[in-house]
């Protein structure tokens, strides 16, 4: 596991976008070889999306031969609702780049058979050859996608009833009216993300510091689902300084030293000077 600690949330977004761009460009995707990318929603990846849009506009990256799979979607929320993840992705990312809509895969929370929708999503991932890079964020309780505390670490894409804490946290997006927050969602499972060849998890802010501590310094625990990625062979966790407040000083120093000595760290230091 790699932990990359950067000064600010803005720099996390920039670094993440550069990493995604490098992975796609190095892969050299084409009509017979698509790059498959797993994507999150929420405030955490917005900076990354903004930078990827900028890089695309500069001609530094194309998404023509990229297939995407999003992590989750609310149940019974219209696609054109401002809080639906379909709406979020199209308005914050997809409509600004050259991706073919046929290559975008987002779970349909209005499907007549939700279980069949989840099974079909897993099959689409398999048919695409699996996911090269799955990007995620986490909640203050360490959940990834809608795999909340207590979720099986062997879980696949499924229907999930949301916890009361999640409903209360998301009420701010629905006019602070908890009755308007969808009670269920479709979500990829922990094992779905673990199957990706590489996982990059973004953590921003002091309110997620305890979750990062649980993910890095303690053992694997289904009450902190992000901790499962300790066992993935290629996990990158990238965070800002505020997110490290619960980590031991020696832990922070160790990972900062590792980054400075890495090729990525040397390259980024050069870019910033």
UniProtKB/Swiss-Prot annotation:
Its EC number is 3.5.99.6. The keyword Hydrolase applies. Pfam families: Glucosamine_iso. The lineage of its organism: Eukaryota, Metazoa, Ecdysozoa, Arthropoda, Hexapoda. Its main location: cytoplasm. Pathway: Nucleotide-sugar biosynthesis; UDP-N-acetyl-alpha-D-glucosamine biosynthesis; alpha-D-glucosamine 6-phosphate from D-fructose 6-phosphate: step 1/1. This is Glucosamine-6-phosphate deaminase. Catalyzes the reversible conversion of alpha-D-glucosamine 6-phosphate (GlcN-6P) into beta-D-fructose 6-phosphate (Fru-6P) and ammonium ion, a regulatory reaction step in de novo uridine diphosphate-N-acetyl-alpha-D-glucosamine (UDP-GlcNAc) biosynthesis via hexosamine pathway. GO terms for biological process: carbohydrate metabolic process; generation of precursor metabolites and energy; glucosamine catabolic process; N-acetylglucosamine catabolic process; N-acetylneuraminate catabolic process. Keywords: Carbohydrate metabolism, Cytoplasm, Hydrolase.
């Amino acid at each position: 596991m790699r932990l990359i600690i950067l000064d600010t949330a803005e720099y996390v977004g920039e670094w993440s976008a550069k990493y995604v761009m490098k992975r796609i460009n190095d892969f050299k995707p084409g009509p017979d070889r698509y790059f498959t990318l797993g994507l999150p929603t929420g405030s955490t990846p917005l900076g990354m999306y903004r930078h990827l849009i900028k890089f695309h506009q500069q001609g530094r990256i194309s998404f023509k031969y990229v297939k995407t799979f999003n992590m989750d979607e609310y149940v019974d929320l219209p696609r054109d609702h401002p809080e639906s993840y379909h709406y979020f992705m199209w308005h914050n990312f997809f409509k600004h780049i050259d991706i073919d809509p046929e290559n975008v895969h987002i779970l349909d929370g209005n499907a007549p058979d939700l279980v069949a929708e989840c099974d079909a999503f897993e099959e689409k991932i398999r048919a695409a050859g699996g996911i090269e890079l799955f990007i995620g964020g986490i909640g203050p309780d360490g959940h990834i996608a809608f795999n909340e505390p207590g979720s099986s670490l062997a879980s696949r894409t499924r229907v999930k009833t949301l916890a009361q804490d999640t409903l209360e946290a998301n009420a701010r997006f629905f006019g602070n009216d908890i009755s308007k927050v969808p009670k269920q969602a479709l979500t990829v499972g922990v094992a779905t993300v673990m199957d990706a060849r590489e996982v990059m998890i973004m953590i921003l802010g002091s309110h997620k510091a305890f979750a990062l501590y649980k993910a890095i310094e303690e053992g694997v625990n289904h009450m902190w689902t992000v901790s499962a990625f300790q066992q993935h062979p290629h996990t990158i966790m990238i965070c800002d300084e505020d997110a490290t407040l619960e980590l031991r000083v020696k832990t922070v120093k160790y990972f900062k030293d590792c980054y400075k000595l890495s090729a990525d760290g040397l390259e980024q230091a050069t870019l910033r000077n």
